[in-house]
């Protein structure tokens, strides 16, 4: 019995010790009014679990931007299309960082 438990814990430890790639999302910046932070809205389409109808779902993520200082130096504007990646928690609700700006907004 103990041998089986030891084997199980060894396999769990080996599986969790390897890290995969961080999750990435592409979305539109909806707010840039914070220092070093932007709010990114990510839209996705998914079927309803019971009825199967395709729904449009959206989630908002707070993402960290190192060189963005709101009143003085704005590097990312509202409407910009950005790629964000998952990272370690930077604050209470910031767990994403901006990797790159894919497309600048046209109404600057």
From Swiss-Prot:
GO molecular function, a single term: structural constituent of ribosome
Gene3D superfamilies recorded: Nucleic acid-binding proteins (2.40.50.140)
Disordered, as annotated region: 1-26
CDD domains (UniProt xref): Ribosomal_uS17
Record keywords: Ribonucleoprotein, Ribosomal protein, RNA-binding, rRNA-binding
Any single GO BP term: translation
GO CC annotation: cytosolic small ribosomal subunit
Biased composition (Low complexity): 8-17
Pfam families recorded: Ribosomal_S17 (PF00366)
Protein's job: One of the primary rRNA binding proteins, it binds specifically to the 5'-end of 16S ribosomal RNA.
Family: Belongs to the universal ribosomal protein uS17 family.
Subunit structure: Part of the 30S ribosomal subunit.
PANTHER family listed in its UniProt record: 40S RIBOSOMAL PROTEIN S11 FAMILY MEMBER, SMALL RIBOSOMAL SUBUNIT PROTEIN US17M
Protein name: Small ribosomal subunit protein uS17
Organism: Myxococcus xanthus (strain DK1622)
């Amino acid at each position: 019995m103990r041998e089986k438990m030891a084997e199980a814990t060894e396999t769990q430890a080996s599986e969790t010790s390897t890290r995969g790639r961080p999750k990435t999302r592409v979305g539109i910046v909806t707010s840039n009014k914070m220092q070093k932070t932007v709010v990114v809205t990510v839209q996705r389409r998914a079927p309803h679990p019971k009825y199967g109808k395709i729904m449009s779902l959206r989630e908002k993520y707070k993402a960290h931007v190192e060189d963005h200082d709101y009143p003085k130096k704005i590097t990312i504007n509202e409407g910009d299309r950005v790629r964000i990646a998952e990272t370690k928690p930077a604050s209470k609700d910031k767990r994403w960082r901006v990797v790159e700006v894919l497309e600048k907004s046209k109404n600057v």
